[in-house]
Amino acid sequence: MKKKVFLFGLLFSLLLLCGCGVNLTSTVKLNKDFSGTRVMSCTFSSRDFHSYFKGSKEDLNKLIKESCPDALTYTSSSSDGNDTYTFYLRFSSLDDYKKKVRDLLNFSPEITYEYGDSPFVSGLIYKENFTSKDLMTWLYTALYEGKYIDKDPSSDLWDLKSTKISFLGK
């Protein structure tokens, strides 16, 4: 009996501690000329919203509208008790992408992009020295400065699920 109570207590504790915060997923959609879009989706449950955020959803909407950098556009939606804010970083070339990313990060990004389509080399090489979490630092900063969240590390707020690369629609 003690073992069952202990296991139940352990399971209950894990469930309480597993509040995920904001699930962040990202897709970089590229064309051969390096034009494209980086799409970053932030999804959170109502429970996580009330656990992390000291304000209403209207406050959050207003904060995002006022704080969203010029390089980004965004949409928001709600479904099944989850809210999603999707941010779009559109770019026309590698130089345009680097400039917009530099403005978001406040440092010069290192981005490696090579594409080969010949009998000797075929494929894509893509590397960057930052994550979507880094690109969303502006939102964390705005939330903290507006006193909507405590100064926990941003790693406690963001849960980066994945970043995918889509090249030529594949």
Question: What residue spans do the PLM features occupy?
Answer:
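Post-signal-peptide N-terminal segment of Sec-exported extracytoplasmic proteins
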Residues: 43-72, 128-139, 143
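Post-signal peptide N-terminal segment of mature Sec-exported envelope proteins
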Residues: 29-48
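Residue-level signal for mature regions of secreted extracellular proteins and peptides
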Residues: 13-14, 61
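C-terminal motif of bacterial Sec signal peptides marking the signal peptidase cleavage site
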Residues: 16-19
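Bacterial signal peptide processing site
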Residues: 21-23
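Positively charged n-region of N-terminal signal peptides that target proteins for export
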Residues: 1-5, 9-11
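Mature, soluble, non-transmembrane domains
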Residues: 71-170
